UniProtKB/Swiss-Prot annotation:
It is found in: Secreted; Secreted, Cell wall. The keyword NADP does not apply. Its EC number is 3.2.1.67. The lineage of its organism: Eukaryota, Viridiplantae, Streptophyta, Embryophyta, Tracheophyta. The gene is PG1. Its main location: secreted. Belongs to the glycosyl hydrolase 28 family. GO terms for molecular function: galacturan 1,4-alpha-galacturonidase activity; polygalacturonase activity. Keywords: Cell wall, Cell wall biogenesis/degradation, Disulfide bond, Glycoprotein, Glycosidase, Hydrolase, Repeat, Secreted, Signal. Residues 1-22 form the signal peptide. Disulfide bonds join C235-C252, C364-C370, C393-C409. This is Exopolygalacturonase. GO terms for biological process: carbohydrate metabolic process; cell wall organization. It catalyses: [(1->4)-alpha-D-galacturonosyl](n) + H2O = alpha-D-galacturonate + [(1->4)-alpha-D-galacturonosyl](n-1).
C-alpha cells in the first residue's frame, strides 16, 4: 500500500509537472502568435538585438504579423536599444488595433540594395486605427547616401527611400517620436484620412537634399500640432488632392517653410482646399508660408480656402510667397504659364522679420491671376540694412488692412 501510494504520488507529480510545463510552452507560443483579444510583442523576445549592428528586420516583421493578426488592442514594443533594420512592410487590414511603442531607436540600413522596387524604409499600407508613439527615434541614416541624390541635377531623378510612408491609413496617430536624417522624405501620407501628428520632432541638416519633414497628398482630415521640424527642404508640404488640414503650434527651421505644392507636375492632379495654418513660428527658413505651382503645369486644378494666421517669422527669407512659375533648379521641361488657379487666400497677423527685402511676393500669371487674396495685419520687416522692406505683387487681386505700408499690395 505504501508502495502504491508512493507510486500514485510520483505519477501525480509527473502529471502536474507536465501540465505546468505545457502551460509555460503555451505561454511562449502566445508571445509569438496572437490568439485572443489583446497582445504585446517585444521584438527582443523574437530575436532582435539592440546592438546597432545585428539585422533585426525578421523580428520586427514577425512582431507585425502577430500583432496585425490578433484581435483587440495589440502592441509592438521597440525597447531601449539600437535596432538595425532593413525595409519593413506593415500591411493590413489588421484584425485589431495596433500600437507601435517606440522606446528605442530603429536604424535604417544604409545598403540601398535592400530596398526592393525603389521601396521605402517603413511602409504601412491599409491599416486603420494605427498608433506610433514613444520617445525613441526612427533614424534613416541619410548621411551615408545623400551623395547619391541626383534630384538637383535631373528632372526625373531616382528618389532615395522615404523613412515613414503611410498609404490608405485612416484614424491614425503618430506622437512623441523623433524622425531623424531620412534618406529622402521623413514622413509621407498618401490617401490617408483623419490622421493626428502631435509632439513629433523631425530633424536633418539644413543642407540635406530633399529631406522634407511631413508630406501629404490626396489626403483629408490631417492635423499636425506641437511639432518641431528642421530639415533640408519643406518642413511641411501639402500635395495635390488634399483637403481639411489643420497645422497648429509648429516650429519650422531650418528648411523651406510650410508649403502647398509643388502642384501641377503630373496629369490629373486634384484640387487643394480648406488648409489652415495657425500659431506657427518659422526660424531662418528659405521660405515662410508658400504656394508653388509648376510653370509648365500638366494639370488644371484649383487651390482655395487657404488661411494663415498668427505666424511669426524670425529672420526667414521670402516670408509670404505665392509662386505660379515654380521651377526647381531650373530643370523644368518647358516654359509656360501655370494652369493652377489660386483663390481665397488669407494672411492674418503675420509678424516678425525677413532676411530678404521682399517680405511679400505674389507672383501670379496674367492668364490665371490670383484672386480673393486678403492681407490683414501683415507686418514683417526686412532685418538687413542695405535695402528696404518691399512687396512684389504681380497679377494678384485682393484687399489689404492694417499692413505695413510697404506691403500693401492692394
Amino acid at each position: 500500500m505504501a508502495c502504491t501510494n508512493n507510486a500514485m504520488r510520483a505519477l501525480f507529480l509527473l502529471v502536474l509537472f507536465c501540465i505546468v510545463h505545457g502551460e509555460k510552452e503555451e505561454s511562449k507560443g502566445i508571445d509569438a502568435k496572437a490568439s485572443g483579444p489583446g497582445g504585446s510583442f517585444d521584438i527582443t523576445k523574437l530575436g532582435a538585438s539592440g546592438n546597432g549592428k545585428t539585422d533585426s528586420t525578421k523580428a520586427v516583421q514577425e512582431a507585425w504579423a502577430s500583432a496585425c493578426g490578433g484581435t483587440g488592442k495589440q502592441t509592438i514594443l521597440i525597447p531601449k536599444g539600437d535596432f538595425l533594420v532593413g525595409q519593413l512592410n506593415f500591411t493590413g487590414p489588421c484584425k485589431g488595433d495596433v500600437t507601435i511603442q517606440v522606446d528605442g531607436n530603429l536604424l535604417a540600413t544604409t545598403d540601398l540594395s535592400q530596398y526592393k522596387d525603389h521601396g521605402n524604409w517603413i511602409e504601412i499600407l491599409r491599416v486603420d486605427n494605427l498608433v506610433i508613439t514613444g520617445k525613441g527615434n526612427l533614424d534613416g541614416q541619410g548621411p551615408a547616401v545623400w551623395s547619391k541624390n541626383s534630384c538637383t541635377k535631373k528632372y526625373d531623378c531616382k528618389i532615395l527611400p522615404n523613412s515613414l510612408v503611410m498609404d490608405f491609413v485612416n484614424n491614425g496617430e503618430v506622437s512623441g517620436v523623433t524622425l531623424l536624417n531620412s534618406k529622402f522624405f521623413h514622413m509621407n501620407m498618401y490617401r490617408c484620412k483623419d490622421m493626428l501628428i502631435k509632439d513629433v520632432t523631425v530633424t536633418a541638416p539644413g543642407d540635406s537634399p530633399n529631406t522634407d519633414g511631413i508630406h501629404m497628398g490626396d489626403s483629408s482630415g490631417i492635423t499636425i500640432t506641437n511639432t518641431v521640424i528642421g530639415v533640408g527642404d519643406d518642413c511641411i508640404s501639402i500635395g495635390p488632392g488634399t483637403s481639411k488640414v489643420n497645422i497648429t503650434g509648429v516650429t519650422c527651421g531650418p528648411g523651406h517653410g510650410i508649403s502647398i505644392g509643388s502642384l501641377g507636375r503630373y496629369k490629373d492632379e486634384k484640387d487643394v482646399t480648406d488648409i489652415n495654418v495657425k500659431d506657427c513660428t518659422l526660424k531662418k527658413t528659405m521660405f515662410g508660408v508658400r504656394i508653388k505651382a509648376y510653370e509648365d503645369a500638366a494639370s488644371v486644378l484649383t487651390v482655395s480656402k487657404i488661411h494663415y494666421e498668427n505666424i511669426k517669422m524670425e529672420d526667414s527669407a521670402n516670408p509670404i510667397f505665392i509662386d505660379m512659375k515654380y521651377c526647381p533648379n531650373k530643370l523644368c521641361t518647358a516654359n509656360g504659364a501655370s494652369k493652377v488657379t489660386v483663390k481665397d487666400v488669407t494672411f492674418k497677423n503675420i509678424t516678425g522679420t525677413s532676411s530678404t527685402p521682399e517680405a511679400v511676393s505674389l507672383l501670379c500669371t496674367a492668364k490665371v491671376p490670383c484672386t480673393g487674396v486678403t492681407m490683414d495685419d501683415v507686418n514683417v520687416e526686412y532685418s538687413g540694412t542695405n535695402n528696404k522692406t518691399m512687396a512684389i505683387c504681380t497679377n494678384a487681386k485682393g484687399s489689404t488692412k492694417g499692413c505695413l505700408k510697404e506691403l500693401a499690395c492692394f
